[in-house]
Every structure is written in C-alpha cells, then in structure tokens.
C-alpha cells in the first residue's frame, strides 16, 4: 500500500510528489492525460521553441526558481532579453508601460506624467491617490473597484483590466484584489496611499537577470526534470481517478488498513493512508461528492475560464514593428478580440531561427468566453487580424499553432478567501485528505510549487504523527 496517492500531474501535483519523495514518503501519482505538466507545455517545432502555456518564472516569487536549482537546472536559467519593456494598446497604438511601477501601479509619478497612455485628467486623478483615505471596510473588493477607488476609472481601464486581471484571464470587476494582490490591500491598510508607500521604499536595483527567468527549451524542461527526479513506477499516466472512498477514520490502525481508496475509470481500487487532490476544483468536487456534499459544493463554486494560445512565426522582414520588448496587453475597451500578445523571439534568446520571429496571441478568458467555441482556424484568423495592423505584418505566417486550455484558469473572484476558509474547515472533517493547486491557494507556477511542497510537508507530518509505516525517513521499494 502506498502511503499517499496524489491525483493530478500538473505543476502542483508534481511539486507535491517531488517533496514527498524528498522526505522519503511513498506515493503514487495518477494523471489522466498522456503526459504530466498540465498547462506547462513546450514544443520544439522546426527550430522554434514554443511555450503553449506559461513561459516565465517570476524572480520576486523564487519558489519556482529554487525548484529548478534543486533539479540541476540552475545554470540553465536565462533572463529576458533587453529592452525589458511591455506595451499597452490604446487607440490602436502601442504605448510603453511607464517605468517605475509595480504591476502598473506607479512608484514614481514622473514616468507617468510623460506617457501618452493616459489623458491629463487621468494622470491628475492618479496623482490624487495620495489623498484618498484608506477603506475602513475590511470586506473583500474587486480589483476594478479597488483601482477605481484609489486611482480612478482610467487607471482601472488601461492598467488594472489588461494587466492585473488580464494575467489571470479574468474579469476585473469580479476578481478579488485580496486573494490575488494582498500586498496592495495590506499597503493601503498600513500606509493609506499606495503611491506614498511605494515612493518611500528604497529604490530597488533591477537584477541583471531582470524580473523573469525561463529555460532554453521552455518551461517544459522543468516538467521533464521533475518527472525524471521521481521513481518511474510512481507516476501513472492515462489513469483517471473516478471516485474517492473513505474506508475508515484516519486514526492509527494496528492492522495497517487503508484510510482511503481511490477508484479509477479502469476498474482499479487503490488503497492509501492519505490522498492529495491536485486537480481543478471542479474535478475535486466530483471526487469528494460521495463523502462530503458540502465540500463538493464549495469546490464546485470556484469558477474557471477557458483560453487559447495562438503561436505564429514570420520572417523578420515581414514584420515592420521593431518588436523592441516582450509584448503587449489589450484593454477590454479596445475590442480587438485578443487579450495580449507575447513576442517570444524578442523576449527570450534562441527561440526562433535567424531572421525569423515567433510570437503568441492569447484569446478568450472571462472577458470573451464564447471565443473558445471558435474553430482553430477562426482563432488563428482572429488573432492575426488583431496583430497585423498593430505590428505591420505582411503575408502569411510561416507557422501557426493553436493550443486550447479548457477550464484551465481558476478565477479567484470576490469571496474566494471566505470560500477557501470554508473548504479548509470541511477538509478538517477528513484527516488525511488534502487539496492543492490553482483553484485553491495561488494561481501561478511559483504559488503552485510553494503550495504543493507545503502540502507535502503537512502530509509527511500528519503521517508521522499517525505513525504510518514508511511515512518518513523510510522509502518504499519503488523509492529505493
């Protein structure tokens, strides 16, 4: 019997498994797909390196970078290429995001005064944030409401919506600022003005590595290294968990009977002392429905958005724009049909053959859920129609790839933190049952890595307290 069954082989599940293995806890990981990694997927196509999902690790959240270093990939981490500039579309033009900002929020007003991204009225309203009192109500608030209240409607439209909500493929008026950007609400509570607080901070010297790192072969390298670090017999692909069964309460059992069984669509019934569900919240809901309807209902309430990534390659001569940055985001009011675009060959070294460019467009999300109903050809045409006038693209692409991510973007909307607390209270009724992944605590790679490893630590501690054999410091046969 395995001590732990991990259901789900995305980055959170793999990180959980890695930490369990590091602590000497026996486990088996079940992944319904033909490969591990979830939305982290990189492909090598005709000399191009295409990230179909996320392409970067955030330096300010070092958990992903630290894991790469542990996996022996530290010397392969590469920074973004200069100039490290992102753009925002307004009025059919691309405007550089003003320097001296934290996720678009100014740390100095000077660069914002000179930009053409905002009207003078909008700039004055942003500067007036210095005099906006802190909100007394400690209740949850949307990103849109927070930014409008503090910086004005123009900042909400052209900064918060494409940047803060856009990176989560969400609705700015529904996403929770407390769940996704707790730093902002904490600064407001402690200092009142965000502008004043950020201006008082010592001026940070940008690392020579910049704000983001990746790997030469894309972030898929990280997934391959994680899989290689685990015992081969511990990962079972193309295995769908269909039901979770509680055999008994999770107190120590002198007969070493399993506390749980995970039933698979192939007819197996796998015993375990503990189970971690590293699955989307709606899948978690289905698995726990038979043992706790309230927990299932809570998990089912977590909304998800579907997105598509459309990758294009062109000859360099076919693109008039200098592509002097990492890409651009598109405010909803622009109505172009895409959320953003990333210039991969300008952002990272060696992503395209010489005299070629590689870029991606992002489509769908909570802003445009019907886009996911389009065919691949329609998604590609929509994306190309949005890119062509902005970048001066002539001719047909040399390469086109469409990657669909159905219900893959968890939406931490207003009320998410209260729901998460209720989920954790419900889990307390089932010792030995754990959840992790983007539907619960954190949505990016660093957060999922951190939460997966923390969950593994909790499992190891719980097994040790329960005195489960082979729980810690002793490896099963598969782990030797």
Predicted regions and their residues:
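Hydrophobic anchor at the start of a short beta-strand
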Residues: 25-27, 275, 397-400
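Conserved flavin/dinucleotide-binding core of flavoenzymes
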Residues: 98-100, 322-325, 339-480
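Conserved Rossmann-like nucleotide-cofactor binding loop
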Residues: 12, 35, 282
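Glycine-rich FAD pyrophosphate-binding loop
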Residues: 21-45
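Mid-domain catalytic core of redox enzymes
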Residues: 23, 237-359, 366-373, 377, ...
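Dinucleotide-binding Rossmann-like beta1-alpha1 core, especially the glycine-rich loop
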Residues: 46-134
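Active-site/ligand-binding neighborhood in enzyme catalytic cores
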Residues: 105, 109, 122-243, 249-255, ...
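N-terminal Rossmann-like FAD-binding beta1-loop-alpha1 element of flavoenzymes
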Residues: 2-29
């Amino acid at each position: 019997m395995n001590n732990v069954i991990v259901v789900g082989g995305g980055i959170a599940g793999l990180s959980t498994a890695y930490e369990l293995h590091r602590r000497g806890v026996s486990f088996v990981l079940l992944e319904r797909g033909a490969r591990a990694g979830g939305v982290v997927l990189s492909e090598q196509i005709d000399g191009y390196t295409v990230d179909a999902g996320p392409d970067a690790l955030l330096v300010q959240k070092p958990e992903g970078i630290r894991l790469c270093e542990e996996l022996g990939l530290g010397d392969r981490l590469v920074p973004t290429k200069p100039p490290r500039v992102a753009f925002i579309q307004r009025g059919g033009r691309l405007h550089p995001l003003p320097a001296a900002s934290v996720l678009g929020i100014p740390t100095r007003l000077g660069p914002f005064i000179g930009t053409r991204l905002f009207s003078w009225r909008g700039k004055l309203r942003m500067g007036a944030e210095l005099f906006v009192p802190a909100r007394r109500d400690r209740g949850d608030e949307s990103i849109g409401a927070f930014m409008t209240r503090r910086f004005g409607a123009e900042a909400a439209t052209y900064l918060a919506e494409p940047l803060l909500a856009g990176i989560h493929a969400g609705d700015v008026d529904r996403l929770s600022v407390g769940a996704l950007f707790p730093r902002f609400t904490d600064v407001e509570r402690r200092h009142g003005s965000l502008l004043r607080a950020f201006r008082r901070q010592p001026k940070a010297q940008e690392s020579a590595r910049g704000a983001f790192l990746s790997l030469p072969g894309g972030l898929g390298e990280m997934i391959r290294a994680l899989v290689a670090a685990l015992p081969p017999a511990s990962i079972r692909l193309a295995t769908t968990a269909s039901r979770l069964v509680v055999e008994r309460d999770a107190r120590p059992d002198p007969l070493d009977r399993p506390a749980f069984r995970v039933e698979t669509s192939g007819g197996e019934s796998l015993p375990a002392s503990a189970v971690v569900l590293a699955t989307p919240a709606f899948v978690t809901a289905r698995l726990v429905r038979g043992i706790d309807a309230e927990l299932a209902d809570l998990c089912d309430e977590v909304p998800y958005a579907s997105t598509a990534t459309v990758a294009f390659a062109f000859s360099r001569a076919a693109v008039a724009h200098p592509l002097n940055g990492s890409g651009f985001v598109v405010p909803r009011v622009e109505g172009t049909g895409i959320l953003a675009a990333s210039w991969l060959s300008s952002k990272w070294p060696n992503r395209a053959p010489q005299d070629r460019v590689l870029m991606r467009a992002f489509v769908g999300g909570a802003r445009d859920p019907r886009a996911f109903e389009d065919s691949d050809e329609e998604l590609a045409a929509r994306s190309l129609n949005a890119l062509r006038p902005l970048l001066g693209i002539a001719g047909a692409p040399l390469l086109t790839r469409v990657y669909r991510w159905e219900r893959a973007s968890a939406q931490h909307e207003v009320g998410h933190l209260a729901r998460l607390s209720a989920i954790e209270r419900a889990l307390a009724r089932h010792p030995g049952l754990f959840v992790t992944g983007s539907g619960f605590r954190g949505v990016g790679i660093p957060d999922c890595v951190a939460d997966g490893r923390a969950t593994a630590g909790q499992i190891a501690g719980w097994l040790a307290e329960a005195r489960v054999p082979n729980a810690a410091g002793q490896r099963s046969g598969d782990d030797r």
